[in-house]
């Protein structure tokens, strides 16, 4: 369990003569922040231990890690250093303000992580992958999507589920369905035991259309591929994953699309 806390440093923005006047106050603030952070993390650890003891949580090995810095940067740095198989984060889910999307730590990690990220909305009960029966995989017919699909299936081999291949389109196009059908046939040969469906979802209002599809088809997890983009693209043209974490109460699994 990784927690990152941010300690604001005011001294650098103060005139030189005022730094000494604020130094003691700043040190006290930092001490107070550290005490609060340690207390909260210990309380969380005790809560997890209690749930493990009661049998509500599985008896697995875990550690608590505390880091100081900008949350998204420290999470990505820790991931690069320790190479976890997956990063699990929480989101506030549906009906959040769009302006919050700009400063979302989870959204930033999703777009920059090279490790799969599972984002779980706060009001969504999600205890284990054994309960996952239907996964929606969104594809744009990019070769990297196929690689990500392989990664998804190989990672979840011990579990039993079906997959719906989804393509977002502005208008109904027979060619899109033909391509989806071809992808389905390809993966059906690779994974004969896997139940695969495919569908095209209208892209004119894709968030609501996709939400309706998820409800109608009882989708447990939405999966999609993230691609490397520069900072201006991320700010002014938010990707599907960044939009969806604020408009869906379904867990979102994002897999980095590795180049061929």
Predicted features and spans:
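A short acidic, glycine-rich active-site loop
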Residues: 23-39
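N-terminal membrane-insertion helices
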Residues: 34-45, 180
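Charged helix-capping and loop-helix junction motifs
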Residues: 102-105, 178-183, 236-241
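Small/aliphatic-rich secondary-structure junction motif
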Residues: 1-27, 133-197, 219, 247, ...
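Short beta-strands and strand-loop turn motifs
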Residues: 88-91, 119, 165-167, 223-226
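Intrinsically disordered or low-complexity boundary/linker segments at protein termini
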Residues: 59, 85-91, 97, 101, ...
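Structural beta-alpha unit
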Residues: 6-9, 46-87, 190-238, 242, ...
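Active-site phosphate/pyrophosphate- and oxyanion-stabilizing loops and adjacent acidic/basic residues
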Residues: 107, 150-153, 185, 211, ...
């Amino acid at each position: 369990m990784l927690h990152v806390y941010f300690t604001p440093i005011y001294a650098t923005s103060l005139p030189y003569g005022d730094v000494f006047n604020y130094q003691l106050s700043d040190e006290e603030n930092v001490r107070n922040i550290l005490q609060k952070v340690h207390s909260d993390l210990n309380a969380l650890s005790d809560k997890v231990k209690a749930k493990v003891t009661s049998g509500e949580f599985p008896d697995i090995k875990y550690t608590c890690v505390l880091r100081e810095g900008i949350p998204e940067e420290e999470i990505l740095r820790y991931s690069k250093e320790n190479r976890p198989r997956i990063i699990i984060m929480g989101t506030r889910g549906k009906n959040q303000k769009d302006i919050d999307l700009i400063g979302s730590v989870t959204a930033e990690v999703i777009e920059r992580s090279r490790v799969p990220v599972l984002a779980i909305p706060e009001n969504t009960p999600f205890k284990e992958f054994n309960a996952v029966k239907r996964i929606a995989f969104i594809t744009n017919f990019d070769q990297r999507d196929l690689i990500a699909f392989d990664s998804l299936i190989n990672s979840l081999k011990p579990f039993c589920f079906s997959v719906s291949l989804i393509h977002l389109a502005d208008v109904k196009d027979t060619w899109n369905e033909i391509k989806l059908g071809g992808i389905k046939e390809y993966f059906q040969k690779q994974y004969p035991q896997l139940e695969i469906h495919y569908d095209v979802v209208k892209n004119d209002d894709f968030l609501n259309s996709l939400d309706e599809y998820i409800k109608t088809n009882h989708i447990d997890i939405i999966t999609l591929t993230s691609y490397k983009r520069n900072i201006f693209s991320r700010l002014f043209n938010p990707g599907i994953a960044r939009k969806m974490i604020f408009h869906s109460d379904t867990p979102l699994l994002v897999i980095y699309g590795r180049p061929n």
